[in-house]
């Protein structure tokens, strides 16, 4: 542990505090003329960049150690005066003078003495940084010598002018502080004198004066063991006479060549000096070693040039020194175990530094962090108020003031007042206020101003104070404290002759009403007149004189006015927002225009409405004569200015800033959340210095607009990644620069930047056989395809609330009070950051579970002509149908007609003989009627035509007997008409079936739209929950929590210091409570979203990747397949399944047991044992129990495949006879495996696409219009039940004519002859006429009968 830093350092020792006073002895004055100086700034600037030395905070350079405090082995943030990180400072160089062999010539300096710099908050100096190296001698830049350390000299003062008669700048007027090194760098002078220029040749008061220059001559002044302690001081005295010196201090310095730091600051205690010398240990920490009694504000400083008079052959190079301005900054400091500051971070330098300071850690792990600790600072003022006539205070200044019980009241509106002028006419003895400060009362705007005045002795001032219970407040005047009010007690001076002095002061001692029960005292209401005013107006001439009217009685007391008249003024104001406001007389000022302050944070005072905000031009809304436009939370959002323009007003809030940091490459980038890049530049006052610089200079790639906000330090890319270490949200990922993939900036190529990639999450579609479980008494008998839609919220919007900004809105007074609440804000930030990390973890787990390596689109995985749009109810038929072969289709003509169900039997009958003769024989019976198809082939046409013509032609020859030949024709007509009728009836029944099926589809569509409505409602609620929470949090900003106003600026403007703290503390306490409740709610919602993410993971794994056996888990009904798509804040599922449309109520049993001993029991597998009462009787008890699956009612015998032996259970059904053993059969419950086999074959699907989630902000998601459309669709579907009219089909084949058959047979014969000659005759001999027989090679094979196989 280090000792107190106030202990004087061994290497920098104070050796004298010479006599302080108005005439400190500074020794003899300078004599002779000044040395001539050659001023050549170009020589010094040419080596300006030789040794760039920026502030390196990692080495704690330029850090002033906290005064009076000591820390050990700790890291903390500290606000004080520090240099800015990476500040290059300003470089200064000294040089040897001109010389020739054997003589020393004029001095060689830069123009530093004419450069007057602003002192501001002070500065620090880096001294001897390049000592012991090799450098140029400046005067001869080609000559390089070892570099020696040299100390700077300074002039510091309040006022600066020009030297006369040379008219050169840089002369310090009045008292000037001089810091002067001497004794060849072994002593430091500090004195405070008036510098009077001497008029000798080349001196400051002479015409040829060029530059103030210090010098010493090492050959004579720096002789070993005998250093000249006043060589430089003597040179300074040659230029100035030192007059009226108030002090002179000397400090010795140990001679060395080590680099060191020196600093100067000033406060009300004086000028403070700091040095990094500490017990001969040289570090970058500077410790306070002296305070100089300089109380006049130092505004400027100048570096005094120095030139060393060295011989030509002994020139040296002198180390440059660097001056860095100090600023009020917050640093993160690391103290080692000894107490020294080993490293630091400038919290305002860049976003990474901001991140480190937010977490008070130098080591930050790779991640995405939300930080925002820099608020908008007002950069101007905007004031507008009514300019009308002056408020008339004449009635108060003329006539005789009334007594207290009959006070007079003046109410002012729509005028400008001047309370300062009014009160200056009186001798004020007391000015006390409530809810407003005296200064604010004189400078604020109000909707009305009320003044009550009366004659009143100041000796009785205590009786008017709050809490008094005397006769004054009971029966005369009671001040109203419900509004801001002030009480002024004053004496009327003799020269104010317009006011007439009364002879007596008077007040009431009682006021009461007489009744049978005695006196009923009547007390004054606040700000109201006494009920006995009518009696008191009669006046009082003696003490305790009473007046009564029979009902009321009052008593008065008088005492004479001695000396000057004394009066009381009660001033009350009311705050409002109307244009008839009362404002102070406006002084001439330049802050009445907003045009030059648009889009920046300003303090505003608009007709009594004060605050802080950003103004910008926008489209006018609201009523112009109302001036102000407010939102639902009573926040000012618009203003109609006196210049005719309308301005939108938004608060000076900080933009959510996220820092993306990669530890491996030590790179970082910045993301401005929920803000457009076009708006970022208007908010730059809130950002770190490097961020503002980059935004202006565009030195980094970007800004780049993304769905999550405006990104800096990124370049866009087409990369798609499966793993992401730095998720940005909305499926975006930050890819840090790496050794394998580096992206150089296009501008300089010297820095690595991040890339924005897209996360790729995919999931395969793997389906398993359907198998339902569970027990129900209503078993489905019919199904339809149905789609159930479901939304699951997996994440909520990440929120980072800048606690300090939310509570205090940038007001330092509030922030100082907020520090007394300890680490509350840091805990809030940590809690929100933890919630965000919890979300990242849950989403990462979800995505890691559902992603796959290789996927293919759904359409690419389907074989054949399968069409996804044709997913509908499978067609179920009750019979089998035979089809002709392809050859038959080629050999026969065919026609398609409506088939009532008899066409197949007719066709089979016709094949057994000549068709022309079998037509009537093959007539079919349907419902008792003979029917024939309504078609004739050419043979039947010829036969029936011949029969008809013959009967007609022969009728005249046979006396009508030949008409019997027309009977077949008539019967064929009758039968065919019957067929047409039967066909129409069957078609009508088919139409009913089709209509029923279509109406079932409509019902399924209605159900689908209903679930869509419900799912959309859940999406809307999930997205809007975040906005509602933020809106509620924002609404609390308008809550006063018992304070006089919700605006801190109003509180600061109205009240004095003590009341300000009390009122602001109420706001802090209330807002912290609201913020704590919000954070607690956010944590609960985060945990709920994490649990929902787990549910979504289960849904994807069980529903999307496979088939679920759980009833109702993956939609309604028997699950088939599910699809997942992206949705705001979650996943949207489409569950496809078989949904029952009708059920049968069956008597079921959990199991069956017999009465044998030991008893045997069986239980169903994935189904039930049911009583099939339609096919069984009570007597047939062996056959009345059947098995049916739970997903479809299909009673079947109990087999080993659908049952198993189990132990006895009380719920099992007992049979009185022997339990039949399960049949040895493979029959199982009816499932849909065969129907869906082709659908499930080679099916795969691309998983959820998480790349295009739209940005969700606090704007409420409104799906009401879409939901109304869906409701209207459902309504229209309810009206869509129609009767369909569509016919069935039957294909009828007709043989070709005889001549076609003749040609066909001739062709076959020719083909057979060719085959015979090729295969037989050519293979058995030399020719078909040879001696060898061909029967051996052409022998036929033995015939055998083929066993017939029947296929059912």
From Swiss-Prot:
Coiled-coil ranges per the record? 1020-1064, 1259-1287
Heptad repeat 2, as annotated region: 1247-1286
Q: Which residues cross the membrane?
A: 1298-1318
This protein's UniProt keywords: Coiled coil, Disulfide bond, Fusion of virus membrane with host endosomal membrane, Fusion of virus membrane with host membrane, Glycoprotein, Host cell membrane, Host membrane, Host-virus interaction, Lipoprotein, Membrane, Palmitate, Signal, Transmembrane, Transmembrane helix, Viral attachment to host cell, Viral envelope protein, Viral penetration into host cytoplasm, Virion, Virulence, Virus entry into host cell
Q: How does it sit in the membrane?
A: Single-pass type I membrane protein
Segments of this protein annotated with the region Fusion peptide 1: 885-906
Report the superkingdom from the record. Viruses
Q: How does it assemble?
A: Homotrimer; each monomer consists of a S1 and a S2 subunit. The resulting peplomers protrude from the virus surface as spikes.
- Name of the protein this chain belongs to: Spike glycoprotein
Taxonomic source organism: Bat coronavirus HKU5
Instruction: Give the taxonomic lineage as stored in the record.
Output: Viruses, Riboviria, Orthornavirae, Pisuviricota, Pisoniviricetes
Query: Gene behind this chain?
Result: S
């Amino acid at each position: 542990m280090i000792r107190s830093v106030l202990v004087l350092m061994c290497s920098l020792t104070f050796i004298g505090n010479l006599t302080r006073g108005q005439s400190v002895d500074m020794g003899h004055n300078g004599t002779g003329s000044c040395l001539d100086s050659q001023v050549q700034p170009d020589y010094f600037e040419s080596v300006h960049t030789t040794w760039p030395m920026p502030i390196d905070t990692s080495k704690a350079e330029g850090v002033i150690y906290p005064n009076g405090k000591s820390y050990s082995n700790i890291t903390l943030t500290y606000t004080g005066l520090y240099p800015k990180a990476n500040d290059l400072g300003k470089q200064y160089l000294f040089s040897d003078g001109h010389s020739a062999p054997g003589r020393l010539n004029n001095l060689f300096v830069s123009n530093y003495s004419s450069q007057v710099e602003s002192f501001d908050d002070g500065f620090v100096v880096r001294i001897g940084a390049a000592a012991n190296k090799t450098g140029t001698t400046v005067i001869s830049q080609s000559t390089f010598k070892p570099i020696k350390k040299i100390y700077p000299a300074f002039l510091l003062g309040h006022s600066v002018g020009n030297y006369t008669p040379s008219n050169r700048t840089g002369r310090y007027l009045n008292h000037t502080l001089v810091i002067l090194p001497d004794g060849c760098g072994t002593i430091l002078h500090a004195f405070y004198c008036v510098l009077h220029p001497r008029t000798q040749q080349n001196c400051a008061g002479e015409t040829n004066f060029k530059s103030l220059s210090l010098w010493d001559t090492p050959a004579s002044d720096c002789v070993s063991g005998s250093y000249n302690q006043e060589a430089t001081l003597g040179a300074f005295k040659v230029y100035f006479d030192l007059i009226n010196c108030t002090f002179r201090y000397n400090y010795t310095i140990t001679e060395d060549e080590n680099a060191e730091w020196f600093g100067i600051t000033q406060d009300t205690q004086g000028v403070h000096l700091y040095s990094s010398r500490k017990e001969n240990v040289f570090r970058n920490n500077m410790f306070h070693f002296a305070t100089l009694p300089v109380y006049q504000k130092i505004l400027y400083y100048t570096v005094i040039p120095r030139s060393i008079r060295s011989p030509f052959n002994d020139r040296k190079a002198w180390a440059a020194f660097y001056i860095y301005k100090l600023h009020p900054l917050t640093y993160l400091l690391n103290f080692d175990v000894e107490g020294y500051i080993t490293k630091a971070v400038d919290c305002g330098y860049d976003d990474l530094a901001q991140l480190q300071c937010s977490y008070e850690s130098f080591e930050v792990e790779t991640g995405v962090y939300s930080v925002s600790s820099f608020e908008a600072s007002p950069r101007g003022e905007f004031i507008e108020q009514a300019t009308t006539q002056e408020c008339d205070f004449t009635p108060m200044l003329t006539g005789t003031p009334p007594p207290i019980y009959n006070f007079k009241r003046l109410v002012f509106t729509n005028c400008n007042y001047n309370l300062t002028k009014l009160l200056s006419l009186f001798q004020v003895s007391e000015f006390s206020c409530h809810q407003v400060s005296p200064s604010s009362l004189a400078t604020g705007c109000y909707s009305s101003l009320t003044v009550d005045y009366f004659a009143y002795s100041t000796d009785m001032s205590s009786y008017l104070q709050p809490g008094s219970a005397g006769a004054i407040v009971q029966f005369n005047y009671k001040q109203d404290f419900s509004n801001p009010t002030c009480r002024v007690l004053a004496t009327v001076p003799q020269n104010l002759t317009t006011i007439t002095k009364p002879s007596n002061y008077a007040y009431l001692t009682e006021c009461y009403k007489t009744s049978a029960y005695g006196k009923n005292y009547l007390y004054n209401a606040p700000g109201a007149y006494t009920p006995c005013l009518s009696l008191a107006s009669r006046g009082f001439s003696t003490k305790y004189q009473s007046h009564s009217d029979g009902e009321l009685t009052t008593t008065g007391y008088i005492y004479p006015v001695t000396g000057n008249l004394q009066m009381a003024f009660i001033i009350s104001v009311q705050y409002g927002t109307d244009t008839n406001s009362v404002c102070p007389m406006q002084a001439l000022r330049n802050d009445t225009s907003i045009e030059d302050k648009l889009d920046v944070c300003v303090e505003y005072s608009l007709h009594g409405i004060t605050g802080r905000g950003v103004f910008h031009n926008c489209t006018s809304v609201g009523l112009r004569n109302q001036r102000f436009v407010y939102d639902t939370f009573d926040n000012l959002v618009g203003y109609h200015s006196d210049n005719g323009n309308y301005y939108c007003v938004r608060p000076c809030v900080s933009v959510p800033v996220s820092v993306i940091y990669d530890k491996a490459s030590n790179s970082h980038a910045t993301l401005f959340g929920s803000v457009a890049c076009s708006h970022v530049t208007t908010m730059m006052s809130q950002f770190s210095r490097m961020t503002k610089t980059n935004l202006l200079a565009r030195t980094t790639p970007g800004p780049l607009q993304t769905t999550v906000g405006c990104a800096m330090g990124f370049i866009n890319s087409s990369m798609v990644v499966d793993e992401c270490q730095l998720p940005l949200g909305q499926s975006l990922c930050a890819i840090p620069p790496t050794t394998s993939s580096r992206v150089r900036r296009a501008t300089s190529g010297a820095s690595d930047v991040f890339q924005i990639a897209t996360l790729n999450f995919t999931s395969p579609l793997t389906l398993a056989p359907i198998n339902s479980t569970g027990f129900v008494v209503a078993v489905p008998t019919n199904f339809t395809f149905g789609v159930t839609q479901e939304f699951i919220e997996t994440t909520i919007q990440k929120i980072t609330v800048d606690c300090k900004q939310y509570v205090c809105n940038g007001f330092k007074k509030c922030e100082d009070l907020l520090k007394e609440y300890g680490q509350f804000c840091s805990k809030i930030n940590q809690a929100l950051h933890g919630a965000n990390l919890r979300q990242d973890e849950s989403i990462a787990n979800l995505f890691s579970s559902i992603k796959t390596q290789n996927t293919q689109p759904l359409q690419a995985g389907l074989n054949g002509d399968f069409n996804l749009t044709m997913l509908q109810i499978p067609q179920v038929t009750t019979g089998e149908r035979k089809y002709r072969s392809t050859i038959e289709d080629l050999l026969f003509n065919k026609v398609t007609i409506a088939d009532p169900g008899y066409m197949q039997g007719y066709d089979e009958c016709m094949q057994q003989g000549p068709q022309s003769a079998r037509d009537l024989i093959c007539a079919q019976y349907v419902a008792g009627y003979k029917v024939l198809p309504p078609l004739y082939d050419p043979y039947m046409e010829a036969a029936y035509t011949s029969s008809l013509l013959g009967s007609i032609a022969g009728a005249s020859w046979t006396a009508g007997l030949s008409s019997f030949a027309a009977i077949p024709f008539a019967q064929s007509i009758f039968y065919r008409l019957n067929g047409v009728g039967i066909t129409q009836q069957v078609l009508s029944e088919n139409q009913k079936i089709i209509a029923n099926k279509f109406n079932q589809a409509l019902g399924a569509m209605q159900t689908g739209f209903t679930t869509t409505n419900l799912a959309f409602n859940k999406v809307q609620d999930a997205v809007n929950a975040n906005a509602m929470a933020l809106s509620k949090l924002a609404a609390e900003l308008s809550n006063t929590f018992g304070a006089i106003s919700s605006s801190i600026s109003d509180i600061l403007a109205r009240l004095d210091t003590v009341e300000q703290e009390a009122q602001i503390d109420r706001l802090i306490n209330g807002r912290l409570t609201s913020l704590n409740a919000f954070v607690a709610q956010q944590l609960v919602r985060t945990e709920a979203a994490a649990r929902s993410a787990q549910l979504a993971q289960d849904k994807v794994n069980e529903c999307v990747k496979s088939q679920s056996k759980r009833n109702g888990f993956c939609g309604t009904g028997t699950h088939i397949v599910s699809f997942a798509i992206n949705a705001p804040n979650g996943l949207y599922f489409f569950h496809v399944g078989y949904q029952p449309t009708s059920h049968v109520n069956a008597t079921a049993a959990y199991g069956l047991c017999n009465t044998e001993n030991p008893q045997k029991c069986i239980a169903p597998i994935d189904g039930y044992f049911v009583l099939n009462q339609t096919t069984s009787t009570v007597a047939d008890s062996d056959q009345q129990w059947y098995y049916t699956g739970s997903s479809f009612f299909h009673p079947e015998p109990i087999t080993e495949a659908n049952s198993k032996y189990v132990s006895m259970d009380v719920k099992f059904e007992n049979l009185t006879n022997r339990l039949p053993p399960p049949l040895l059969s493979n029959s199982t419950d009816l499932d849909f495996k065969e129907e869906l086999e082709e659908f499930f074959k080679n099916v795969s699907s691309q998983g959820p696409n998480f790349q295009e989630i739209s940005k969700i902000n606090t704007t409420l998601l409104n799906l009401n219009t879409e939901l109304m459309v869906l409701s209207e669709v459902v309504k229209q579907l309810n009206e869509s039940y129609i009767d369909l009219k569509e016919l069935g089909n039957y294909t009828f084949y007709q043989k070709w004519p005889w001549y076609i058959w003749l040609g066909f047979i001739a062709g076959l014969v020719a083909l057979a002859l060719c085959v015979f000659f090729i295969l037989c005759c050519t293979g058995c001999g030399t020719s078909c006429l040879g001696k060898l027989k061909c029967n051996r090679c052409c022998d036929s094979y033995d015939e055998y009968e083929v066993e017939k196989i029947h296929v059912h």
